[in-house]
């Protein structure tokens, strides 16, 4: 991680040299950039860093208010094709959302959900909608024709299920954990299922113009975040306790260790590129990306492998 003499000389010639890396402060499974700062990895990479907060990492990255963040492909991919100034630079983890139904309901598979209302809590056209479409499509269910995807906020989904307004909802595994454990909900399809376990859910993303103008600094930033992800993967108990102590994870220690172990933090570049391309192809086919239809062209802006 420490820059070589050659890297340091190259960094000094880049416009962002001497400026603080603005990492987007997030918690839970997207805390990699924050953990990198806490463990001193940016300094080790020859960089100064400062955390920034906001309502949307997509807006923060696209406007240059943040340099780096970890977040859902499903949140950022469509904006990237709509000229938002973001590119993916590395993989983060698999997981971390699933389709849930009432445990005592008649629904046991996605096939059973045909003709019903399913909630994508953060809204139509947003990340939950996109993920729901992918999960249904994988089982041969047309998300536009075979079901009705609607928006019911996560905290209202249980009531809506009980009242029969919706059959299922896409929820974060963290949110649903206690409800599954107490027998209220069951999972019928997940991004952790075997056929999705070879796809990134979340990725390291950066401001695209910054990456273009500062390739070596961008490489060192990405390496710092990847080192944090490796730490989280290799030391799940210690990392979980640290995240809880810092207030970056909610819920129980037991739940967080289990979920952190399932996410496979720190995915390599080849895996990430192949899985991103696969997701792009699905988004184009399902009409989730509407203003571009060439996978290579989309990949040319969405994927910048700074570690190569």
Feature roles, as predicted:
Residues 280-308:
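Conserved C-terminal helix/tail region of periplasmic/extracytoplasmic solute-binding proteins
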Residues 212-290:
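Secondary-structure end/capping motifs
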Residues 66, 162-165, 262-275, 302-308:
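Short amphipathic alpha-helical segments at helix boundaries and their inter-helical linkers
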Residues 2-151, 167-173, 184-190, 197-198:
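Short, glycine-/small- and polar/acidic-enriched structural segments
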Residues 73-74, 150, 155-245:
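Pocket-lining segment of extracytoplasmic ligand-binding domains
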Residues 45, 88, 240-242, 291-293:
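Short, hydrophobic secondary-structure boundary micro-motifs
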């Amino acid at each position: 991680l420490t820059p070589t003499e050659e890297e340091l000389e190259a960094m000094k010639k880049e416009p962002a040299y001497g400026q603080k890396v603005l990492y987007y402060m997030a918690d839970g499974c997207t805390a990699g950039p924050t953990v990198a700062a806490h463990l001193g990895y940016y300094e080790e990479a020859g960089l100064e860093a400062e955390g920034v907060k906001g309502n949307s990492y997509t807006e923060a990255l696209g406007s240059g208010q943040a340099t780096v963040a970890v977040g859902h492909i499903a949140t950022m991919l469509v904006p990237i094709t709509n000229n938002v100034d973001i590119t993916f630079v590395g993989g983060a983890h698999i997981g971390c959302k699933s389709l849930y139904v009432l445990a005592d309901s008649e629904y046991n598979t996605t096939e059973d959900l045909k003709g019903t209302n399913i909630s994508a809590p953060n809204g139509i056209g947003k990340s939950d909608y996109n993920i729901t479409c992918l999960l249904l499509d994988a089982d041969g269910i047309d998300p536009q024709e075979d079901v009705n995807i609607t928006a019911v906020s996560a905290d209202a989904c249980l009531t809506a299920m009980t009242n029969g307004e919706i059959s299922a909802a896409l929820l974060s595994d963290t949110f649903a954990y206690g409800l599954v454990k107490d027998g209220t909900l069951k999972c019928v399809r997940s991004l952790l299922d075997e056929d999705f376990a070879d796809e990134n859910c979340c990725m390291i993303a950066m401001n695209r113009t910054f990456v273009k103008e500062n390739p070596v600094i961008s490489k060192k930033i990405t390496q710092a975040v990847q080192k944090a992800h490796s730490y989280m993967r290799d030391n799940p108990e210690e990392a979980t306790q640290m995240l809880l102590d810092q207030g970056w994870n909610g819920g129980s220690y037991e739940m967080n260790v289990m979920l952190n172990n399932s996410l496979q933090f720190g995915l390599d570049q080849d895996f990430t590129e192949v899985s991103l391309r696969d997701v792009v192809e699905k988004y184009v086919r399902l009409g989730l990306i509407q203003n571009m239809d060439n996978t290579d062209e989309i990949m040319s802006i969405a994927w910048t492998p700074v570690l190569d």
